[in-house]
Amino acid sequence: MSVAPETTVALQDRFFRELPELAVRWQAETFPELRLLVLNEPLATQLGLDTGWLRGPDGLRFLTGNLVPTGAAPVAQAYSGHQFGGFVPRLGDGRALLLGELVDNKGRLRDIHLKGSGATPFARGGDGLAAVGPMLREYVVSEAMHALGVPTTRSLAVVGTGRPVYREATLPGAVLARVASSHLRVGSFQYAAATGNRDLLRRLADHAIARHHPGAADAEQPYLALFEAVVAAQASLIAQWMLIGFVHGVMNTDNMTISGETIDYGPCAFMEAYDPDTVFSSIDFWGRYAYGNQPVIAGWNLARFAETLLPLFSENTEEAIALAERSFGVFQTRYDAVWATGMRAKLGLPAQVDAEFAAALIDELLALLKANHVDYTSFFRQLGRAARGDDRSAAEPAREMFMDLPGFDAWLARWRALGPDADAMDRVNPIYIPRNHLVEEALAAATDGDLDPLDQLLAAVTAPYTERPGFERYASPAPEDFGKYQTFCGT
């Protein structure tokens, strides 16, 4: 490791200075042969980073932690977590480092974080490395989520390391440079609470308020206001996942952010045929994190968050619990509002349509989609075509997706009678998402050294609402011979 000139990049070490008990100073491993696989130039510009420098030797060393700016203090962060319902008191960044924070061109403090940078004291016997495929998967999906308007961590770059990674096969290694509003998690609070150090817990809460929810500082009960703000942010986030058919796959408490951003894309995937029981993760044997369970699991995680904050709510435990339970009502209210508003937009419903009528229309449609195994993303885009005409030909692309034509036609007639707005529908219903078969195709090619399929896929999913000639295959569901899809965390 070496130190960069002061004028290159200015990183802060706010997390380490304010919460040293939650951080271990550490250095990235030195890698033999760095090769830039993908660089997010628009994001780099937002961060005030010179893209030409990032592409050069020093920039690549910076993106892998091998060149540290003067004054920076790379750390592995400590946190706990409930993993598939079981509490693990000591998790932490086993193969990641927080390089530091910088201020972007909008004045926001952002984390620069490395994934796959080598083993840390939290590695739990792992090698601390990451393979090209999983790192590029996170790059593709996180940038697609950003383009879809969903709060998410961002991907700045993926750099090949020249070091082999030994998994089920020998794979080329890579480091992902990730950008986030912060990496504070529910698990961060669980770790602080487990220490029994009330001062640490309070400082962590104050840090979270200052960084993410500053309005809570002026509330009569700031820590209760923090809890309510996180509950509201997560309720909104999960509703947005549900609206686009996103399945996170590993909703452990250490993967739930205080900022309300989506984080950690290991076993994630997008649902194709609509089914609330959709599961992709190879280790989610009981469907705990199935698509339809995501709101319930989010609530469960937030209850664990509330438990950590009880000492800050009140010295009286019963009173603290009562306050938490009352505040938790924010979740369902916010979730229902974001979901209902989003579904109305997906259906192009005018504002004057009665809420109860709209809810019944939505429920009936979802039942039809499930019963007919209809591709979720394609359907809503094709339905927009049906809103552009009253004849059967305009509706035919959507009708062709159903076996129960009488059932769908009856629903279609009621929907058309409401005067849906086709242009509004096209603004919220994507035509391109990271289709599972196309992601696998791009990752396999990239692992073999061919980045063209990755570049094409990124071109599609980072402009998801604009239909373009030559991109037809990126709008199509997986072929039947693709089979049942499973994902793996890549650890």
Swiss-Prot record:
Keyword Aminoacyl-tRNA synthetase found: no
EC number annotated for this UniProt entry: 2.7.7.-, 2.7.7.108
Residues that hold ATP according to the record: 92, 94-95, 115, 127-128, 178, 185, 264
Cofactor(s) required for function per UniProt: Mg(2+); Mn(2+)
Superkingdom in the source lineage: Bacteria
Pfam families: SelO
Catalytic activity, reaction form: L-seryl-[protein] + ATP = 3-O-(5'-adenylyl)-L-seryl-[protein] + diphosphate; L-threonyl-[protein] + ATP = 3-O-(5'-adenylyl)-L-threonyl-[protein] + diphosphate; L-tyrosyl-[protein] + ATP = O-(5'-adenylyl)-L-tyrosyl-[protein] + diphosphate; L-histidyl-[protein] + UTP = N(tele)-(5'-uridylyl)-L-histidyl-[protein] + diphosphate
UniProt-annotated catalytic positions: 254 (proton acceptor)
Top-level class of the enzyme under EC nomenclature: transferase
Keyword Translocase: no
Binding site for Mg(2+): 255, 264
Coiled-coil positions: none
GO molecular function annotation: AMPylase activity; ATP binding; magnesium ion binding
Keyword list, A-Z: ATP-binding, Magnesium, Manganese, Metal-binding, Nucleotide-binding, Nucleotidyltransferase, Transferase
Sequence similarity: Belongs to the SELO family.
Protein role: Nucleotidyltransferase involved in the post-translational modification of proteins. It can catalyze the addition of adenosine monophosphate (AMP) or uridine monophosphate (UMP) to a protein, resulting in modifications known as AMPylation and UMPylation.
Protein name, UniProt field: Protein nucleotidyltransferase YdiU
Source species: Mycolicibacterium paratuberculosis (strain ATCC BAA-968 / K-10) (Mycobacterium paratuberculosis)
